[in-house]
């Protein structure tokens, strides 16, 4: 009995990518395995990771359209083969890749005749087109078509509102889901006297990220969900091992920078003009700060660690990571 417990406690779980391929610019496939698992664990992990992959991975898409030539959504435009509704559906399918936060503007300015494709969209620097050949409309006559677009990064699926906006813009259904499909299967086997399982996981993405990247983000999101339970245990039971942990005292980032003196070259750093996008923060930390409306280095430095720890999913270790990054990038010495 003791030997069985020892064998179980020393087993090492391992992920492995057993197949990866690009079927098209907008369809990536990956197949992964996780083993060895105890009986029942594969189904638990499979259900959880599938839900996270399909519902909580952030994506970027076009969410709103505006043009003077559009009287209403179900109208037609002279000189354009597609109806307005068909153009909206084509814009909905455009696959975008970005690390932006919130909403940004884009536009199309096209003079016919010719085919309007995704490459004709004028995008902000932080957004990329995955497939430039995606069709939008066929302009059959020498007419000008100007369209203003809103681009947003979010998660899940959002159905358009039925009412029109006062500025004449129209919502379109927003599918922020970069993961197209997820399947999992379980292979059971016997190892000695112990029943074990292998979890097989198949992931298809739209090309804005790879299946491996999607799996990493989903795993991190799942881990973050359980962090509060770990913190609660530390607070309520005051575990002995907590004495041996390296923890950071509560401080204001700005106070530390003042003590260490802001690094200067020829001019003092304009903290307001340094955005956290430039700091190369880990995606999870970056998203935590953005969701709390912390956009610049100055806004970050004016927060104490106590205030940052109130941010959902922000951990003590994240504060240390930020300080390390600021030191590496020489914002202070």
Curated annotation (Swiss-Prot):
Stretch list, region Alpha C-terminal domain (alpha-CTD): 266-333
An example Gene Ontology CC term for this record: mitochondrion
EC supergroup of this enzyme: transferase
Residue numbers spanned by region Alpha N-terminal domain (alpha-NTD): 1-233
CDD domains: RNAP_alpha_NTD (cd06928)
Enzyme Commission numbers on file: 2.7.7.6
Chief place where the protein resides: plastid
GO biological process: DNA-templated transcription
Protein keywords: Chloroplast, DNA-directed RNA polymerase, Nucleotidyltransferase, Plastid, Transcription, Transferase
Family, similarity comment: Belongs to the RNA polymerase alpha chain family.
HAMAP family, per the entry: RNApol_bact_RpoA
Biological role: DNA-dependent RNA polymerase catalyzes the transcription of DNA into RNA using the four ribonucleoside triphosphates as substrates.
Subunit structure and binding partners: In plastids the minimal PEP RNA polymerase catalytic core is composed of four subunits: alpha, beta, beta', and beta''. When a (nuclear-encoded) sigma factor is associated with the core the holoenzyme is formed, which can initiate transcription.
Protein name: DNA-directed RNA polymerase subunit alpha
Biological source species: Phaseolus angularis
